[in-house]
A protein has these predicted regions:
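Long, distal/terminal scaffolding or interaction modules
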Residues: 1-203
């Protein structure tokens, strides 16, 4: 599908009527791409707009480019892969599935993330994350690799604000990191490394 002349409604209508693997080119900020998709694969070139993969329920979305805000909003299952950076509030309230970001994430990534039943959502950020990472996190795994950072912190201000569950892994010595009192911070142990190993391998 050439999305360069389609608004988000027309584009999403075509997606819903095209099962299997679908390649989308010329993406220019169209919203809600893949929202609620249960199966199939979307391969996107360009920049999808807000709420990419919102309510995703099993499909796979891969983006060759950047993505805007709210990637994987309330995601339940499936996988989103972004070969670029993403905007704010990625993984908002996600309760299953996996999001992989090659570059950086904006503010409030992983806000309200939660685990549900046997589902453990995972958000993997290859670069750095903005302020309020893991805000009100209740479950799931956030992993920040900081591969693009050599001198600056890989997480900005106020990480884990209001966090009361889940795990946040940082490839960092933690110097200068200010965490709320309710958050237990420690070096990763063998069990931790085993837990995140599959996500690092997937990345």
């Amino acid at each position: 599908i050439d999305a360069s002349q389609l608004d988000h409604r027309r584009l999403n209508e075509q997606i819903r009527h095209s099962p299997g693997t679908l390649r989308i080119t010329g993406c220019l900020g169209q919203r809600f791409i893949g929202a609620g998709a249960e199966r199939g694969r979307l391969e996107i070139t360009g920049t999808p707009g807000n709420a990419l993969g919102a309510y995703l329920d099993g499909a796979c979305i891969e983006v060759r480019g950047n993505a805007q805000d709210a990637v994987g909003d309330t995601m339940n299952d499936g996988r989103i892969i972004v070969h670029g950076s993403i905007g704010d509030a990625a993984g908002y309230a996600m309760r299953g599935g996996e999001i992989y970001v090659q570059g950086d994430a904006g503010y409030r990534a992983g806000i309200h993330m939660k685990a549900y039943g046997d589902k453990v959502p995972a958000l993997v950020i290859g670069g750095k994350a903005g302020s309020f990472l893991g805000e009100y996190q209740a479950g799931g795994i956030i992993l920040v690799l900081g591969l693009s950072q050599t001198h600056r912190p890989i997480v900005s201000n106020f990480p884990c604000t209001g966090m009361y569950g889940g795990k946040l892994y940082l490839r960092s010595d933690g110097r200068g990191l200010r965490l709320p009192e309710q958050v237990d911070a420690r070096p990763a142990g063998e069990d931790d490394l085993a837990e995140i190993g599959k996500y690092v391998e997937n990345y």
